[in-house]
Structure formats: structure tokens, C-alpha cells
Amino acid sequence: MKTIAVNSFKGGTAKTSTTLHLGAALAQYHKARVLLIDFDAQANLTAGLGLDPDCYDSLAVVLQGEKQISEVIRSIDSSGLDLIPADTWLERVEVSGSLAADRYSHERLKTILSTIEHQYDYVIIDTPPSLCWLTESALIAAQHALICATPEFYSVKGLERLATFIQGISSRHPLNILGVTLSFWNYRGKNNAAFTELIQKTFPGKLLNTRIRRDITISEAAIHGKPVFSTAPSARASEDYLKLTEELLFLLRDI
């Protein structure tokens, strides 16, 4: 089982959309068994797959020892895509209940996921766009980190802080930076070279070749609670996310 934490330091980087479509592509087109984990209290991944966050338990109850992980997994479709939804309790889970007194609470998610390692080919975790307990727990539980950015000043500058955060974790836990993916890409953007140069400086050799172009069909798919592969299979967003999935599979082949 390969576990990937999808990260950003700023909202609006298509982090959740990337998580959703990577998982959907692996399940639908590569016949993989995929578990998506919405680990962001905003619950956009949950809503984007057509579930109401107010109606389901999140990993919070599992982290607190109140339920088993099998009790919070929801089947999304017959392709092999499952989801653990998010809820607002995630936002404060580390300061309540049994986690509050556990000095090793960051390790708990890793332990929980080890109990299902034979059930899935991939676990993909959508983390909050901040350097918090949830993000640290996800990175400790993961073998790989996928970083999302946009060709904007604040997004790219935030990568420097994220790089320092990840470096601190990888010094204590094995963690591979799978790559940096750029979304909302305009091939005619006048500052493209400057942005890509800064990313290469922050994460040398990690900028992925695939660019996710801006496409309204992604937002339209979210309204229907489905991946864009289902609502607009011929859209450029579908093409881009399939290419991204292929590129990541190539990078993962020997790891």
C-alpha cells in the first residue's frame, strides 16, 4: 500500500481537486483499490464526492479510539474508490479526548492505517492548507508527499515554509517528495519562467512536467459530486489529470 499526502501551504491551489482526480483516475482507469482520506475540516473533498459532511463520521472518532477505521470508510462507486469523510471535529481533535494527553499523538494515524495496508493499493490524504497537527500526522503516516502550487506569488513563496516543515519531518520519518504539481496553468503566462525557477530552487528536480490548466468543468463536476471524468470526460481537465496520474505512476513504479 502506497500512502500519499497531498499538501499546500495556501488555499486555492487545487489541492483537493488534485486529490480527488488522482484517486478517481487510479480507481477508474488503472483498476486500483483506492482510499481517499479527507483530513481537512473544510470537508471540500467530501462534498466534492457528493457526501454531506454533517451526516458522516470522520477519522476523528478513530483517532480518539471510539470507532474502528472500517466503520468510517464509505464506498463512492463500484470502481474501487472509497472515502473517509471529514467533519468539523477534525479541527480540534488533537486537543480533546485521549489525544490531548498523548505526546506521540502524531503517530496515531500511521498506526491506524497499518491495519488496512492489505485492503488498498493507494491511500491518498487531503491535508489542510496549513502547517498544523493534521498535516504533520498525515506526512508521518505517508511514504510520499505531493505538493500543490499555482503560478502566483503567495503560492510559490509559501512553498519555502512548506519545504522547511517537510524537511523537519523527513529527518525523523522516511518521506519522499513525489513532486510539485502546478494548477490553474496558462501556457502564455508572462511570469511562468520566474515561478518555475523559484519552485526548482525550493524543490530541486521535483517540478512535475504535467500542468493542470484552468477549466470550468472542474467546478461543474464538483457541483454534481463527481469527478470530471464522469461529467466531462473529453474536457482538458480530464486530459490533464490523466496525464498527471500517468506521470506519478511512472515515478512510483520502483518505490
Curated annotation (Swiss-Prot):
InterPro entries: AAA_dom (IPR025669), DNA_Partitioning_ATPase (IPR050678), P-loop_NTPase (IPR027417)
Domain of life, per lineage: Bacteria
Pfam families: AAA_31 (PF13614)
Disulfide partners: none
Assigned protein family: Belongs to the ParA family.
The protein's name: ParA family protein TC_0871
Organism annotation: Chlamydia muridarum (strain MoPn / Nigg)
